[in-house]
């Protein structure tokens, strides 16, 4: 068999560097159009350089506005300048969503090979071990809490209170990262007072700034002329429309470049960017559906099946009855109507369904549900192993409640 990779070697004609610069995890040494925010962070943290206590910092801004990259960039420079005096911990609060898991993660970063378990040990022992290790090394601890609002939504102010107590018992500060502009107002007074953070705002990138960022990322990586200027401009325009999202603009360009490499195309055009956007959005949709809990998938499938026979609109009562039929076919116990209502609210928040409340006269008020992309979503749901024997349940319709929904 011929080597299947030979046909891709011609990409060397226009790829002269490492495409990791277009990876979402790549943190460049320079961040165009974030010089002001980086300088403000450096100024706030500068007291660490002469033995002082730095202010806590909160970074606000939309997704893709450079908050995380800037925080990591600044703390890398701090580590380079301060050396072993500073212990820096990056915590993604989507993954480590409690003070217990955060403390375990931090202790394990000091221990090395003999890691302590994520569960089972009393919290006061973990706390003691962490304080002891920080003090024995005479370290200044800087904790980056990415998506810090996740801690608040799950645990109230308690987790942040414990983290701030740790930094008070040792020496340290936090850099909190959030896209929730009202985050500080949701904290209780004891935590807000202890936090006393400086706020730094990351305004959305505009199209010109995104164009600069894209050109910076491909400079020295892609040969001139391989990507049409109009393609870069389109990526920047799409990112600007999405609240100045640099991450999306970079991802679109990466998908388009990789597609053109695979297809041995001569250059990246605006058509390739449109194709990349379609793939990008479908990937997000697929991932959103795949990661849903099983009962959320069954509710969504019920809405789709009901919608297929009901003029593209499903009534909540119909959805619940058909959901119970799906549960019976799959062999699971149905949840209560109240719990299903909560699941539908979550699906609405994710943009997978659109909910409208409509008066039904003497029948009262009901919610009408429309699934946004029913064909694609149905296919993604049925890829789940739990649905491998699903044959299609009998569809219930509440004809008394059905009126004219053509305007929805």
From Swiss-Prot:
Family (UniProt): Belongs to the CDC6/cdc18 family.
Coiled coil: none
Gene Ontology molecular function, alphabetical: ATP binding; ATP hydrolysis activity
HAMAP family, alphabetized: ORC1_type_DNA_replic_protein (MF_01407)
SUPFAM superfamilies the record matches: P-loop containing nucleoside triphosphate hydrolases, Winged helix' DNA-binding domain
InterPro entries: AAA+_ATPase, AAA_22, Cdc6_C, Cdc6_lid, ORC1/CDC6, Orc1/Cdc6_arc, P-loop_NTPase, WH-like_DNA-bd_sf
Keywords, alphabetical: ATP-binding, DNA replication, Nucleotide-binding
Biological role: Involved in regulation of DNA replication.
Record flagged with keyword Cytoplasm: no
Gene Ontology process terms (BP): DNA replication
Protein name: ORC1-type DNA replication protein
Bilayer-spanning residue ranges: none
Species this chain originates from: Picrophilus torridus (strain ATCC 700027 / DSM 9790 / JCM 10055 / NBRC 100828 / KAW 2/3)
